[in-house]
Amino acid sequence: MEITPKLSVTEDKIRLLTVKTDMFKTACLTLNVLVPMGEYAAEYAVLSSYLVHSSKKYDSLIKLNSRLEELYGALLSGSISRHGENYRIQLSITCIDDSLTFDGKSVTGASLELLLSLLTKPSADENGFSPEQLSTEIRLTAEDIEGEINDKRSYAMTRMLETMCADEIYGLTKNEILENVKKVTPQSLLAAWKFMLKNGIIQLNAIGNISEDDCKKKLREAFSDVGERTPYEPETVFVEEAEDLTELTEEL
């Protein structure tokens, strides 16, 4: 059986990539959000962790884990990575195929609803995100950044890129991000999240036994309160000439 990916754009200017198939025992649903590095770099580093630990409906990790158990042990993850002068925030959930459930209910559909709610309905109000949870997320994010030095290969690659791109946004150093992470407030995190929803480039990848129409319907419902979206235009800085060789040695 041939598997054919289908790419479309919803009325909310969200990219949708669907690969509908019943060949697998699991479904993988992934939200990718592209945002510019710069003003909210530290906030995005925190958001990538914060968003997969709670939501408005499941306002604690215990409640969220309980919901994941109800979805037959669905696996949830969040990450952030650099792509040029942009950050890619990725939220992903993996669940069993609907044909394997005992009661015949749609685990895939429910998992997609949960994933979308984590992005569009986090545990925040008009005053900002929860100060208590934010404190925990800042600590976890800081520990993750500081811990990279223990992976010498990753640390060396990071330092090389920071040195090569010292005069570019892409060269934003871990120390600069770490310093700003500790200054993140509930209000600044809320501002970054609002920008992400309104102006981020969002793509949903849905692989499994779920249709394009079902995905579009759930996307429409999830983003109904967001308003008109205006995704930003990414800009890439090209360096046309090679500069002098720079050597850097650090003793650890």
How does the language model describe each region?
Residues 138, 142-149, 160, 164:
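Glycine-rich, mobile lid/loop segments that gate access to catalytic sites or pores
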Residues 17, 25-42, 62-119, 154-179, ...:
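M16 family metallopeptidases and their MPP-like homologs
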